[in-house]
A protein has these predicted regions:
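Active-site-adjacent beta->alpha loops and helix N-cap segments on the catalytic face
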Residues: 147-159
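Bacterial carbohydrate/catabolite-sensing allosteric modules
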Residues: 1-18, 63, 104-109, 157-164, ...
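Short beta-strand segments enriched in small/hydrophobic residues
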Residues: 36-40, 75-90, 197-207
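N-terminal helix-turn-helix DNA-binding module of bacterial transcription factors
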Residues: 1-81, 354-359
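Short beta->alpha connector loops
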Residues: 66, 119-122, 143-148, 168, ...
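Amphipathic helical "hinge" segments at domain boundaries
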Residues: 51, 55, 64-129, 136-139, ...
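Short acidic/histidine-rich motifs immediately flanking catalytic phosphotransfer sites
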Residues: 133-139, 257-262
């Protein structure tokens, strides 16, 4: 009796020594007597396979009860099912919330997330160069980082799909907020409470990563003062490295002035927390002696009663990731610029000027 060809045997016959074994693409290829590439082309419905071979491979897949894994399908399409997320200073609460939003969407879409922390321009450029030099991911989400024209050109040439969050670049889908308006919201809130001497604490303008959020929030602050015919006073503006401890030091400096501000607008909640700590240490009651407003509305802001400008951090990360997934699927993303709304959240750290006990 002639021996039955291997490719015509059932899965039970092929896998009887290990009933729990899941058949993979290599076993299909070996059983059908073809290469893995041929099986991949059959899965991908390529026309470059003869009908006879296609039929044999399909018969083997049926007999072995083969079910393509997600990774096998991805490889057949030249995909890694991986997305790189570039974020600056991962430990910052606002960054962590954006990141969580992005990872949640990517996970639902079946992508693994590779997070690259960036703390210098050199780090940023190395990670971007890796994206263009080798196909390590199907695309990238860039959070709060500015990209040079040359780096953008490299990414486009390499065909790397890209979406940005809290940053913009020509021709790239981006998810942003209007930080000028945000600065205005915070300043208007304090002016409505009767404050006229409002200090400002924010980031240094000369960081090598090119962050622009503080500059835009400061611009909103200045424009709002001008609309109310209040002169901008650089003596009550302090800019420095982004941290609660540095902000606390700058706040102590402001509170020690002969004419200290009655309110301080901090360009981030992290910096506002430093202001609150400095006020407590120097014996200034918040909000009786000093009103404080932050920006971001991170999770701890509500717990501490911090008045702040709310921006949808998690939603922004999710939106950026969703737009990238659309690009990877080959869909047209419009509009390129998605602006999310801001709102002023009033809590116990801000109060009327008269209530603050200043005559």
């Amino acid at each position: 009796m002639q021996k039955q060809p291997l490719w015509q045997r059932s899965r039970r016959e092929v896998s009887r020594l290990n009933p729990a074994h899941r058949v993979n693409i290599a076993e299909v290829a070996a059983t059908a007597g073809v290469s893995v590439g041929t099986v991949s082309r059959v899965l991908n419905e390529s026309p470059n396979v003869s009908e006879k071979t296609r039929g044999r491979v399909m018969e083997v897949m049926k007999r072995l009860n083969y079910r393509p894994s997600r990774s096998a399908e991805s490889l057949s399409r030249g995909q890694t099912r991986t997305v790189v997320i570039l974020v600056p200073f991962l430990t910052r609460p606002s960054v962590a919330e954006r990141l969580a939003g992005a990872i949640g969407v990517l996970d639902e879409e079946g992508f693994d997330s590779v997070v690259r922390n960036v703390e210098s321009a050199d780090q940023r450029d190395r990670h971007l160069a890796a994206l263009t030099a080798r196909h390590e991911a199907d695309g990238a989400v860039v959070v709060s980082l500015r990209l040079s024209d040359s780096r953008l050109a490299d990414l486009r040439t390499a065909g790397v799909p890209l979406a940005m969050v809290d940053a913009e670049a020509p021709g790239v889908p981006c998810t942003v907020v209007d930080d000028i308006r945000g600065g205005s919201l915070a300043t208007e809130h304090l002016l409505a409470l009767g404050h006229r001497r409002i200090g400002f604490i924010g980031d240094s303008p000369d960081d090598d990563l090119g962050f622009i959020s503080t500059r835009r929030r400061l611009l909103g602050y200045r424009r709002t003062l001008a609309r109310h015919r209040i002169s901008y006073d650089p003596a009550i503006v302090r800019l420095g490295p982004h941290s609660a401890s540095v902000a606390a030091s700058m706040a102590r400096d402001l509170l020690g002035l002969p004419e200290p501000p009655t309110a301080i607008f901090a360009a981030s909640d992290t910096q506002a927390l430093g202001v609150l700590a400095a006020a407590e240490k120097s014996g200034h009651s918040v909000p009786d002696d000093l009103s404080v407003v932050g920006y971001d509305d991170i999770e701890s802001a509500a717990q501490l009663g911090l008045s702040t400008v709310h921006q949808p951090l998690g939603e922004s990360g999710a939106c950026g990731a969703s737009r990238l997934c659309a690009l990877i699927r080959g869909q047209l993303v419009r509009p390129l610029r998605e602006e999310l709304p801001l709102s002023m959240v009033t809590r116990t750290s801000s109060a009327m000027y008269a209530v603050a006990g200043v005559a």
